[in-house]
Design a protein with these regions (language model features):
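A residue-level detector for the "anchor" residue at the start of short, highly conserved motifs
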Residues: 1-8, 18-287
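Active-site-proximal cofactor/substrate-binding loop regions of enzyme domains
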Residues: 11-14
Length: 287
């Protein structure tokens, strides 16, 4: 779809840590996180931790783990590996990372996300657990592939979908690109569950604390723009936009005037422009 810039009255000071952009009043403060730059990391099922900051290949307990310079780690095996506690891939804010699971399924994790997964899947189900946002390209099999979260489970056989489940967000979403998925939602206020079937182009949005499930047609290109290195927002609240940008660049964002968070924007921009340039463009788009 085409994204249009539209004007809104926004007066703000954007604090970048390396300089100031002055507007009439102080409304929004944005500063780099004080945490040092972090790389993605693996925690293996025996507790061993591996920083994914360089190319490597290692044989470990019957597995071959390969990490590339392109930001992707894969798990390969030639024989059955004894079942054990799951592994965890952690992706800090300010970065992204890809993972190839033992069945060939590819997962791309957005900033501030974790995925818990086994070294080798069992014969009854392929189960992983997501916190944050992940883009899944699932290898087809008669064994179901299940992505679990405390508020939403997604069950597939082979398909492509995007799931967003950050613990601090009020909504969990699943957007389907290809195939078919069954989405089961778990209310956080009682023990009720709701299940719906998605076909390509549909998105399930669930508010776990309200128990509200909604299914709508969406622009899947917009919903998965982050996979192409883009920010794409169509009629999205500024508060939500700044939360996403904050995660992507490890920024702390504070709205001194809460009303600004509700202003809706239409913005499309490449992520590699850097946060300073992106913030300038957002200012132009909003006032």
């Amino acid at each position: 779809s085409i994204f249009y810039k539209y004007a809104a009255v926004v007066a703000c000071l954007v604090m970048l840590g390396v300089g100031y952009y002055f507007y009439p009043t102080t409304e929004v403060t944005i500063s780099p996180s004080h945490l040092p730059a972090q790389s993605a990391y693996l925690v293996l099922n025996d507790g061993k931790q591996i920083k994914l900051n360089q190319q490597m290949q290692m044989d470990y307990n019957g597995l071959r783990i390969i990490n590339t310079n392109e930001g992707k780690v894969s798990f390969q095996h030639d024989k059955e590996v004894p079942s054990a506690s799951p592994n965890k891939l952690g992706v800090p804010e300010g970065t992204e990372y890809s993972l190839q699971l033992s069945d060939g399924t590819n997962v791309h994790l957005n900033a501030g996300s974790t995925l818990i997964f086994p070294s080798v899947f069992g014969k009854d189900a392929r189960v992983v657990e997501l916190s944050g946002e992940g883009y899944f390209d699932v290898t087809h099999s008669n064994i179901p592939f299940i992505v679990k979260n405390k508020s939403m489970d997604v069950r597939v056989l082979g398909t492509t979908f995007n799931m967003t489940a950050y613990p601090e967000d009020l909504m969990v979403t699943t957007t389907l690109l290809t195939g078919k998925v069954a989405v089961t939602c778990h209310s956080q206020t009682d023990s009720t569950t709701q299940t719906t079937i998605l076909t390509p182009g549909l998105q399930a949005r669930f508010q776990p604390h309200e128990g509200v499930l909604q299914v709508d047609s969406v622009d899947v290109e917009e919903q998965t723009a982050w996979r192409r290195g883009e920010f794409a927002f169509e009629d999205v609240k500024l508060g939500n936009i700044m939360t996403i940008i904050g995660r992507s660049f490890a920024l702390n964002v504070t709205f001194d005037t809460p009303e600004l968070q509700d202003i809706k924007c239409f913005i499309s921009i490449q992520r590699d422009k850097g946060y300073e340039e992106i913030l300038k463009i957002i200012h132009i788009a909003t006032g």
